[in-house]
């Protein structure tokens, strides 16, 4: 055994052993407990960042721990390989997205391997390969035929220069991020998943997910947004509108209908369009609305604007005429594209009414409540503790009674009905992009939209295309889109839109169970053997979209008979971000020039807080920006490869797991990395000294001295606490702290006798086993050096010897009037009276109680004695 810890050699040897033995290749073993551990797969952006390292190390620690519990563990990996970054890189570098993607995958795979992750690489999936996406095309055709996927017009952000649809994030101040052109709202045909058909189940089955963070479940509940209300129908005022008809709105507060003073419609609503025909101002306002963002978040924060159309509708209960406004805050794709406005009890309507001098009619009041129509107060929107006023026959009712009475009358007059509604909208998956999965539909003039037959799948995406950013490349390739109709044989046109890349990541977890299966999307037998995933790990930023879509897809696959479980992920761990300090200088134009922490020399105070910083290259000061998520934009990232090259993967892994609990942010610290490396060198040094003296004989537990019992107690206390920390709570940082505490004991332990050395042997074996999931390479080497023929990867997690934890005697602190005055050692079985007597008799305690009257003695069993005297 070398005297010096050499991570490069140790890690290469361990990884070589795992590869040769196929240590992580798993197959179904009926009768053996399974554990499916999955970290969210990466986008192949070019190289790993520290967020990846943290995510995959957390997963690996859990997977290795479960393997040591004797389970058959599956931990696969793949690549979420379609998406816009590849197209952007292709345009920048004039290279096909496929080439860029596959080169990135090769490099990132080598990085993942260098981390020593226990991954079954035989199950690797790459979502941009036809053998993967053919199966989502197959599912698409099945769902299209069932009506779960349908086609309709959808409103999108259209860039008239680049001739393409932009995501909301690509619209900056109303202009395209690349072209700078003013963005238009445009309606184009798109394909939709009918996720709303599963809204009730997606909501109710959240209650079954006991292993998910409550925060994530709450976010999903709010996103699905189940609400109880009513459809309310307002008859057209024929004199002002010119035609007969009805305006329908949905409201969660029909109880406030008597306070409605106007209605607002979206720019695309037929009433708005009708008004625009004869009113140029309305036509111009509609054009302005259409140029705005279609993002709900933007709608919430933008200035609310409206214009009176000159039209009126009839209040269904009072017969009053209510003016119709066209407003920029009403979305055509949501509900009926119209809302009833009750300014007195809705904050948005209140602001709008005050802006345009519209009536505000209070219909709720409460004891001690004063209503002021010029200033919004939060109670205006409450339901509880209020009663109706100014509502005619509905006066004096609480929320529930007013709701029932008003909806009852609306139903009786055919002007409304109770309705349960969801905030969730159907999932539009059409993308006018190249680098995505082709939508398997053929458009025929005679037959309409025809799914591509199964024997013609996959529809293969050509991989030699270099996009130029103007429109969809596929729409310019007759060799791709020209085809014949599968039904009638006539010339037809293939769909040139591709699928939202969230589709690929919505079912990959199931494909891992049978990645090479050619008989279907998944092999149901293999899928049901492994699924649901026992532990899923990923960032909180995926709480809604990815996790909701994956749950939806799992239910779609269940209904196709592919899986038998209802939910894809039993337990979810959302890891925190990796953050680091930031430094910058302000430029003349007001921008910021960010410097990497490695290029900055810092001055710290006694608490290690940065109080000064200067650039190493010129010695001049830089501004301290605080700690933020590692990112390219802030130039505060640390390349994992540099860390692995300098310290080894085990140091990297140990630091990541020790720096903070996995669900909290992890602050990068060079000193912390060096500390982790120092600790591993300590373990190596102790093991080297022990092994060099020759391995001892067997430990005789029955003949241990009190000092030896104390050492053995520390060993088994570490097992007990680390088992609880890793196995029950995923508190890897406190488990590592237990191992460090044990190391302190072992370094001081006696080595004079064979029994002493046998005890240190047991201690080192336990240190090795407890560290094995966290620092697997050094553990692999130490296990062999400690005399074991089997590899530590095949070892069992250590068991606690409860008898070792039993103490013959206890050391208790003795206080006098709350101040430490001595220590006593008493038998573990000592009575309260014996403990009190020993405390009173302590020499130092006698000195501090001399001449005082002892009023009472407080004994805290196993901890302390406090003598109160005056």
Swiss-Prot record:
EC top class, as a word: ligase
Short motif 'KMSKS' region, span: 629-633
Highest taxon in the source lineage: Bacteria
Catalytic activity: tRNA(Leu) + L-leucine + ATP = L-leucyl-tRNA(Leu) + AMP + diphosphate
Major location (coarse): cytoplasm
GO biological process: leucyl-tRNA aminoacylation
EC id: 6.1.1.4
Residues holding ATP: 632
Protein name in UniProt: Leucine--tRNA ligase
Positions of short motif 'HIGH' region: 42-52
Alphabetized UniProt keyword annotations: Aminoacyl-tRNA synthetase, ATP-binding, Cytoplasm, Ligase, Nucleotide-binding, Protein biosynthesis
Subcellular location: Cytoplasm
Gene it is expressed from: leuS
Entry's family note: Belongs to the class-I aminoacyl-tRNA synthetase family.
Any one GO molecular-function label of the UniProt entry: aminoacyl-tRNA deacylase activity
GO cellular component: cytosol
